[in-house]
């Protein structure tokens, strides 16, 4: 969408934008953005040509994604062919969720999932997640180590207390948020 061709010709554009809550000690670090080229994202071909998984952050089967974060997370972008099935292993103490972008899934042989749905898995219970695509499906599977801190959100800010929210708005109004630096990985 930043290319001259896209600007001139238009077309469909789809993205998933994620905001990751930071530990309290890191909330006031300077903002940043990671521009990651698709060529730097490992692609895992799933068994029996059933689909593929792109490891954007974290690790899957020995492949490490290029995105970095302040606390341990996994961000996997997956696709499964119709009637394909795969079991994903996730860290036992992570919070895990699946966002279905397209298609239809059956999770753990019991939960039917429709497009534009989010599934939140029970922590410490579901470390083996079986996914069956009843249609060609695209999804994002995310896991993260719980911060175990209070959360207070309002508008674009997520802090730990209401007072910190007020301070964040005040800092923003006063221009204290600085410039956004782009961390780009280029060959």
Report residues per predicted region.
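Jelly-roll (double-stranded beta-helix
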Residues: 1-187
């Amino acid at each position: 969408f930043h290319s001259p061709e896209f600007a001139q010709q238009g077309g469909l554009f789809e993205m998933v934008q994620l905001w990751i809550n930071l530990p309290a000690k890191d909330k006031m670090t300077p903002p940043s953005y990671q521009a990651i080229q698709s060529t730097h994202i490992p692609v895992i071909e799933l068994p029996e040509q059933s689909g593929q998984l792109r490891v954007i952050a974290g690790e899957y089967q020995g492949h490490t994604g290029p995105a970095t974060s302040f606390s341990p997370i996994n961000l996997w972008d997956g696709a499964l062919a119709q009637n394909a099935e795969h079991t994903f292993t996730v860290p036992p103490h992570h919070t895990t969720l699946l966002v279905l972008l397209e298609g239809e899934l059956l999770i753990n042989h019991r939960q039917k999932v429709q497009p534009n749905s989010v599934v939140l898995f029970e922590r410490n219970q579901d470390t083996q997640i079986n996914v069956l695509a009843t249609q060609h499906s695209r999804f994002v599977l995310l896991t993260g180590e719980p911060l175990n801190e209070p959360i207070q959100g309002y508008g674009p800010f997520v802090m730990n207390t209401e007072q910190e929210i007020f301070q964040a708005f005040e800092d923003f109004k006063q221009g204290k948020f600085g410039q956004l630096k782009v961390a780009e990985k280029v060959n």
